């Protein structure tokens, strides 16, 4: 089983359960770009180029914060993937995510321009961000939150932010 139980929760070897790990910076950036429908420019490369397609030397604020391999030595082929305080602060209140979430022609903007109901919009955001439909409880809470928000846009943007900063999005499991 991938989840712990009372007999294996303290095990740190023998593969008795799966240890979630965060996505690599390039993978996470590409996932965020896909979910928000907003691409990052990478120097002279055409718009739509993914982070995984770029060479290591291409500047990227996000990849610098979330860790990427600089491959200066063979021993450093893999970047550090342990979350740190700087990453957490950027997830919680960084402008990077907010700009992508509220971008013109981004996912939320496209949902607002479509004829999708709140229920359909919630389902679409869940499928985009964490690859599953919301549970009935999650659907009800999200729907109530959107209805109570100052506007539909604010409610959907907040929901997308919550999904992008969730463990289910950030960790591979």
Question: Language-model segments: what does each one mean?
Answer:
Residues 1-135, 168-173:
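An acidic, gly/pro-interrupted, aromatic-rich
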Residues 153:
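Extended, non-catalytic substrate-recognition/exosite surfaces adjacent to catalytic cores, especially
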Residues 162:
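Short alpha-helical functional segments enriched in proximate histidine and acidic residues
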Residues 159:
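Globin-like tetrapyrrole-binding proteins
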Residues 140-149:
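Amphipathic alpha-helical segments that form the core helices of the histone-fold
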């Amino acid at each position: 089983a991938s989840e712990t139980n009372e007999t294996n929760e303290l095990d740190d070897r023998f593969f008795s359960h799966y240890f979630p790990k965060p996505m690599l910076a390039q993978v996470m950036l590409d996932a965020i770009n896909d979910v928000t429908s907003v691409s990052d420019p990478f120097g002279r490369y055409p718009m739509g180029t993914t982070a995984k397609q770029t060479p290591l030397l291409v500047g990227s604020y996000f990849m610098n914060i979330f860790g990427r391999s600089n491959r200066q030595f063979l021993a450093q082929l893999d970047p550090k993937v342990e979350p740190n305080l700087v990453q957490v602060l950027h997830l919680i209140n960084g402008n990077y995510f907010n700009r992508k979430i509220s971008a013109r022609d981004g996912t939320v903007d496209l949902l607002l321009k479509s004829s999708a109901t709140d229920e359909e919009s919630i389902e679409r955001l869940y499928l985009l961000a964490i690859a599953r439909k919301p549970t009935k409880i999650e659907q009800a809470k999200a729907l109530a939150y959107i209805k109570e928000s100052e506007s539909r846009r604010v409610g959907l943007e907040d929901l997308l932010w919550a999904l992008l900063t969730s463990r289910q999005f950030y960790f591979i499991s």
